[in-house]
A protein has these predicted regions:
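C-terminal, non-catalytic tails of nucleotide-sugar-dependent glycosyltransferases
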Residues: 2-51, 72, 76, 193, ...
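N-terminal subdomain of nucleotide-sugar transferases
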Residues: 39-96, 146
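Short beta->alpha connector loops
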Residues: 58-59, 111, 132-135
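Short catalytic/ligand-binding loop motif for oxyanion handling, primarily in non-cytosolic enzymes
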Residues: 61-62, 89-93, 135-138, 158-169
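A short, charged, and often flexible helix/loop element on the N-terminal side
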Residues: 91-116, 129, 189-199
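Acceptor-binding helix/loop patch of EC 2.4 sugar-transfer enzymes
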Residues: 97, 156-203
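Carbohydrate transferase catalytic cores enriched for Leloir-type hexosyltransferases
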Residues: 100, 125-130, 147, 164-168
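Short N-terminal targeting/anchoring amphipathic segment
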Residues: 118-135, 148-153
Length: 205
């Protein structure tokens, strides 16, 4: 900062010694969040279109683009909301448009029931799984807990190969030589949760 800016901050701190702490507390508590959420919900819940939950990974690329294109194609017939994983066993609920500021974050450990309640409030009537990378059982159980149907679109080999692309550590095609080869691969590059290949496939298929 310039000397002028530093001098202004020094004056501000002298006149209002609690200013910075109060600003940080305001940002942390976000008292306007509920009002913003209610406006966003009213915007989403127009009542004329069914709401579909698209489950995605936290990466960019073709899968994300497919969801955006699908939401645009079906815009007049359905409203999409997108669920992505976040660090710390959390998930983010957003609209497909990356420029839309609507976002709700839930801790799956502490706020799973709140997530279910929000999805019901949104009127989610179908779950479309596009990718399970970063997600665990709580997200896999959403259709059952919500009492709705689901679809699964396979965009890659993640359901049968934790490495996603049927490649070895040298990035060459593995040859798909059988269960033992897969388990040997998982010794070097473990699957999320440390599952063996048969347990992995049973969970994801």
């Amino acid at each position: 900062k310039s000397p002028r800016e530093r001098a202004a901050m020094d004056t501000l701190r002298r006149l209002h010694p609690r200013y910075e702490a109060e600003v940080l507390a305001f940002v942390r508590d976000d008292p306007a969040r509920l009002a913003r959420t209610m406006v966003d919900l009213a915007r989403i819940l127009d009542g004329s279109r069914p709401v579909i939950l698209a489950v995605l990974h936290d990466r960019q690329g073709g899968t994300e683009r497919h969801v955006h294109e699908l939401a645009a194609l079906l815009h007049d017939r359905a409203q999409f909301v997108v669920l992505r994983p976040l660090p710390g066993q959390r998930v983010s609920l957003r609209l497909p448009d990356p420029d839309d500021a609507f976002e709700l974050v839930f801790s799956l450990a502490d706020e799973y029931d709140a997530l279910l309640s929000m999805l019901r409030q949104l009127g989610v009537c179908h779950v479309h799984y596009h990718h399970l990378l970063g997600h665990g059982k709580p997200v896999m159980q959403l259709p059952q807990r919500l009492g709705v149907g689901y679809d699964f679109t396979a965009h890659d080999y993640f359901s049968i190969c934790p490495q996603i692309s049927l490649t070895r550590r040298d990035n060459r095609y593995c040859g798909e030589e059988g269960v033992q080869q897969c388990n040997d691969c998982l010794v070097q590059s473990p699957a999320p949760g440390g599952l063996d290949i048969l347990s992995w496939r049973a969970r994801h298929t």
